[in-house]
Amino acid sequence: MAVPVLSSIAGFLGITSLRATGRDAYIIITLRSLRMFTSGIPSLILALFFASLNFQDSRIGVFMTLTLLGDVLLSLLLTLIADKLGRRRILFGGSIMMAFSGVVFALSENFWILLIAAVFGIISVTGADCGPFRAVEESILSGLTDEKTRSDVLAWYVTFTTMAGAVGAEVAGRVVHTLEKRHDVVKAYHALFWAYAAFGIIGSVLCLGLSERCEAAGERRTEMQERGRGGNDGEEEEVLLETMTPSTTDGFHHEEGRPARRADIRVPPQKKQSYFSQISKSTRSIMYKLWILLAIDSLADGMTPYSLMNYYVEQKFHVSKATLGDITSASQFLCAVSAIFAGPLAKRIGLINTMVFTHLPSSIASAFIPLPKTVGPTIGILLFRAALNSMDQAPRTAFIAAVVKPEERTGAMGITSMVRTLAMSVGPSITGLLSGNHMFWIAFLATGTCRIIYDLGLWVLFVNVKVGNKPTAREDDLSSVDDEAWNGLLSDSDNDSDFSSEGRKSKDLERTQNTV
């Protein structure tokens, strides 16, 4: 009795889907959890580190801005070429760049050297995940799953990484508090950057365990095999895969010693493929609308991040730093727990409905944060908002994966990440201006309004977009295989028939001559 019950619970929570996806999913989730755990190190100590080196505040501001800009541009570039260069190579190279930045910060105290390492390397200045990792990882997970398991696996991806970020922020905060009591603070900060570099090395080692299934071509190959092409069609399948896929077959090495293909199967000449992902017109028509809505939502998130909400609560109610830390930890914990249920909910009411019906109450709560006159109700609204705030993340990624062709998925997710980051970076400046004029409450009202516009826009524009059993972009792409490939295969079959027909004719003629 206990086994069926546990099996049902595992199926409901998406654990069965996660196990079915395999080792690659575990490695991807571990990679991002590791990064989220370590992202708190630079975000907490960078300003303190620069202050200990007597850098001017204006230089620190320039450093943060240029680092964010460099991260956006580098991330966009790497995600656009990830499918061609190899997704595993991008993840491996990004981990090495993360380690490189940590080593430079551990060894150098020169402002310009540190700036170059931050702009051209990967280091988090906001406490959030940075670099090209998330877009590539979400693309990989989307390719490893199908429409039935995707939302479950992505929900666990969000859950584990959010929890790791919460634990990492708590650990980093306590470590920094301990280090502040030491006399040689600079050396202590250098030691933390060595730890940051070490986590980058660990991440690069984990990348070596990823299989070929993570690549765009490996994803296509698995998909073709699942479509049931028989044993005699192996050679044709190989031709079609090479014709259809502009990507590498794997991220680290090229297969050698592959058996020679039959000479009588002609492979049509392929056009030279660009290293950059090509976003088709059909994809752009959907993503343009979604990008505009996501920019509005990200602007709202940037106006009232956790740091500014804590500042508002501290200024209004004069609570202790420990209380603020407890509120933040509780909020992140609720985000992580609630994300578990996003997958099961999406399978029952749909991706868009899950995004809207969970995010809309959170959006309304954001606008009501300034209303309470006491700290208790304010904290209650903050926690209610946090409990529903992240439930749209996994369904959103699953929706993008469903409406975008597989070969365009990584590039589309990279552009999505760039749009969100740029829009989010504008928010704190707006809130700063409002706070300076004693109108902080307007920032919360504007946040709620923008988020409600995002939610209603999602529902109006996308609620009727079917992503279930209809022939989506993926199947359209598979069913519309390059005509030249089919023509080449058909003409080969015709030629084989002609050759056999001519052979029969010559034998008949020879038999007739012998009879005569």
Predicted features and spans:
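Juxtamembrane intracellular "pre-TM" segments in multi-pass secondary transporters
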Residues: A2-G22, A217-S298, Q315, V481-E484
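Helix-loop boundary and gating motifs at the non-cytosolic
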Residues: A10-L73, I286-L294, S298-I327
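Hydrophobic core of transmembrane alpha-helices in multi-pass small-molecule transporters
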Residues: S33, S101, F111-P132, P377-D392
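Transmembrane alpha-helix termini and helix-breaking/packing motifs in multi-pass membrane transporters
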Residues: A47-L48, G165-K187, G343-P344, V426-L445
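Helix-to-loop junctions at the C-terminal end of transmembrane segments
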Residues: L73-R87, V176-H177, S338-L351, S435-G436
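Structural signature of the two symmetry-related core transmembrane helices
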Residues: R89-V104, N353-F368
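Intracellular juxtamembrane helix-capping segments at the cytosolic ends
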Residues: I123-T145, M391-V404
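Symmetry-related core transmembrane helices of the 12-TM Major Facilitator Superfamily/SLC fold
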Residues: K187-G209, I442-V460
